[in-house]
A protein has these predicted regions:
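Hydrophobic residues within beta-strands of alpha/beta enzymes
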Residues: 1, 55-57, 115, 147, ...
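Conserved, mostly hydrophobic/aromatic
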Residues: 47, 87, 118, 147, ...
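Generic structural signal for well-ordered alpha-helices
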Residues: 7-11, 40-45, 70-77, 100-107, ...
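N-terminal pre-domain/capping segments
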Residues: 1-42, 223-242
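Histidine-acidic metal/acid-base catalytic patches
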Residues: 109-113, 123-242
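Active-site acidic/histidine proton-transfer and metal-coordination neighborhood
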Residues: 16, 20-21, 25-26, 30-114, ...
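Active-site beta-loop-alpha junctions enriched in small/polar residues
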Residues: 1-2, 24-29, 60-62, 90-94, ...
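Short, glycine/charged-enriched secondary-structure capping and boundary segments
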Residues: 11-14, 37, 69-72, 101-104, ...
Length: 242
């Protein structure tokens, strides 16, 4: 939070419990570019003061020009270098990185970009499982420093239940993508890779008709995804060390 007392309270709790954390920025949505830039700058500096492992940022807007979004990325990179806190930019609808084909030119021009990869958004935007955008996918994998692990489809950013056999193809593909991100992190000798199982609440999670009851239990599915990723990690390490 921007409020100093609230921020101090949270930071003290994190210190007392010896917790690392990933900070989240999503608030900046101003249409006016100058106001947007100023607010983004303020939020990033505010989060960096808390010394998180990294800041996951919803950066830019899908309707800004390439040059405007590039200016925001350059500013964030300057803040990262100044503070020593990594800033990752989430692949998210409505932001500069809303689609695979529009994110690729930024990755090609700016090698310093770190991504929070959530390809479920890209699948939904492209109305495909991105089988025809392998260049963008492979490039994004190499830039991934943080993973939001949600299983999406060509029609929705979140399948109703990734445990459902009807969603097996989607689950297998996302596990492969996440595995490739982990392999790249190992190959480039990263200190760590952070992952958040992100099966979201409503409106990501659908309600049963005429109720306020979610069709699936959010905690159960995120725990399922966590276990799937852990199993995949073990397999990757065994394969690399065999």
């Amino acid at each position: 939070p921007i409020n100093l007392l609230q921020k101090k309270k949270i930071c003290c709790l994190l210190k007392d419990f010896e917790l690392d954390f990933v900070a989240q920025h999503w608030e900046t949505k101003e249409v006016n570019f100058t106001k947007h830039q100023d607010n983004l700058k303020r939020h990033l500096y505010n989060l960096a003061e808390a010394k998180p492992l990294l800041i996951n940022s919803h950066t830019g807007m899908d309707f800004y020009s390439y040059a405007q979004n590039a200016k925001l990325l350059e500013m964030a990179h300057s803040i990262e270098e100044e503070t020593g806190v990594a800033i990752t930019h989430e692949t998210h609808r409505s932001r500069f990185s809303f689609a695979a084909h529009t994110c690729l030119p930024y990755l090609e021009e700016y090698p310093f970009i770190k991504l929070t990869s959530d390809f479920s958004h890209w699948c939904c935007v492209a109305e495909s499982m991105l089988e025809n955008q392998t260049i963008a996918i492979q490039k994004a994998i190499k830039h991934t420093y943080h993973i939001h692990a949600r299983v999406g489809s060509a029609q929705t950013p979140q399948v109703i239940d990734p445990r459902d056999e009807n969603n097996k193809n989607e689950l297998d593909l996302f596990l492969k993508w996440w595995g490739d991100m982990l392999k790249n992190a190992i190959a480039t000798e990263r200190e760590y890779m952070t992952i958040v199982p992100e099966y979201g609440p409503h409106p990501y999670s659908l309600y049963y008709p005429n109720t306020k009851s979610p069709m699936r239990n959010q905690w159960e599915i995120n725990n399922f995804v966590r276990k799937e990723i852990l199993g995949h990690c073990c397999y990757i390490y065994q394969t690399l060390n065999s």
